[in-house]
Design a protein with these regions (language model features):
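Hydrophobic and amphipathic membrane-targeting/association helices
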Residues: 1-283
């Protein structure tokens, strides 16, 4: 019995000795874990989801209104909810919305360091609107950015030289300089690059890319889901996910409106009715 107590005491003393001898390593690991947790919490972007319900009148169909040949091509019956799902996901509906809201322009902050993510509470989101892309809270706004086909889907680097001037570096390394709040045109062998930067705070650099219509539509479809709610209900549930709450709500509203407009233009004013919209859910961190 005494021998067992002594063994326990020896084990306890050995454990304390190990802790004392390696306290620096243990403390370092604890601090590293703490910093890693803070980094993830600060840099992780929350994802939101917005929904809109659309009632489809079974007496008419957006596809049938476009002509019998199109309806036959899609092998769809009048009033088919699945047919309307395909219409909403079509280029005819999505591309005008992308064009209106500049969703074919990607803007991402360059060299977002570990220290920046650790110290800044949350990254400020870039918004896509009818007037351009950016976020005035960080002094960034791009009203226009158009590039030749050879440069589409490729990254440019935009850097503020000072509060009045900027530098744009093309994917092949060519450098151009322009003035903030002034439309600029840069000539290249592939064609003209048009850009208008209305606001750009010094000290920041950004990756810019102008997407092809096909790529922009593909990106939007990845976040857009449309399906019939229930079976043969004639009600479609459209949802859009993204990091910017206001933007996804505005974008989905535009998609629904564009769908309704197409039906109105084809003398199908009673085809759709928006039942509910601007509802969103916080999905993940």
């Amino acid at each position: 019995m005494d021998q067992k107590v002594n063994d326990d005491e020896i084990d306890l003393r050995a454990l304390i000795a190990v802790l004392l001898n390696h306290w620096k390593l243990i403390l370092s690991m604890l601090l590293l874990g703490l910093l890693g947790g803070i980094y993830y919490a600060q840099s992780a972007t929350p994802i939101y989801k917005t929904n809109s319900l659309i009632q489809v009148d079974k007496k008419s169909s957006g596809v049938s209104a476009l002509g019998a040949d199109v309806a036959d091509l899609l092998n769809a019956q009048d009033g088919s909810a699945q047919t309307e799902v395909e219409i909403i996901n079509s280029r005819m509906i999505l591309w005008p919305v992308i064009n209106q809201l500049h969703l074919d322009l990607n803007v991402n902050q360059l060299k977002d360091s570990f220290l920046d993510k650790l110290l800044i509470k949350k990254n400020v989101l870039v918004s896509h609107t009818e007037n351009g892309v950016g976020n005035l809270k960080v002094g960034l706004w791009i009203a226009e950015f158009n590039v030749p086909l050879a440069y589409q889907n490729k990254n440019f680097v935009l850097t503020a030289i000072d509060s009045q001037n900027f530098k744009l570096i093309s994917p092949d390394g060519a450098e151009f300089t322009g003035k903030v709040a002034t439309a600029s045109r840069f000539k290249t062998s592939a064609g003209n690059i048009d850009i208008q930067v209305t606001s750009l705070a010094p000290g920041y650099s950004y990756n810019l890319s102008k997407l092809t219509p096909a790529k922009a539509i593909e990106n939007l479809r990845k976040n857009l889901a449309v399906a019939e709610k229930g079976k043969q209900t004639g009600i479609l549930d459209a949802s859009l996910t993204g990091a910017n709450q206001d933007e996804i709500t505005h974008t989905l509203t535009r998609i629904v409106k564009m769908y309704e407009t197409q039906n109105l233009d084809k003398s199908s004013a009673e085809t759709t009715k928006t039942l509910a919209s601007v509802s969103y859910t916080h999905l993940t961190l």
